[in-house]
Amino acid sequence: MEIATLVAIFISGLLVSFTGYALYTAFGQPSQQLRDPFEEHGD
């Protein structure tokens, strides 16, 4: 394989991994610890 193909696959893998981690943090188990600024405002 050419070096450009390997670099493209590596960058794509990083992007998919980061997106998966962001979704897990936003909607998975760690999301229970996130604060909600709209709940704190309380009008």
Swiss-Prot record:
GO terms for cellular component: chloroplast thylakoid membrane. Keywords: Chloroplast, Membrane, Plastid, Thylakoid, Transmembrane, Transmembrane helix. GO terms for biological process: photosynthesis. Pfam families: PsbN. The chain crosses the membrane at residues 3-23. InterPro entries: PSII_PsbN. The keyword Hydrolase does not apply. It is found in: Plastid, Chloroplast thylakoid membrane. It is a single-pass membrane protein. The keyword Acetylation does not apply. Its main location: plastid. May play a role in photosystem I and II biogenesis. HAMAP family: PSII_PsbN. Belongs to the PsbN family. This is Protein PsbN. It comes from Euonymus alatus (Burning bush). The lineage of its organism: Eukaryota, Viridiplantae, Streptophyta, Embryophyta, Tracheophyta.
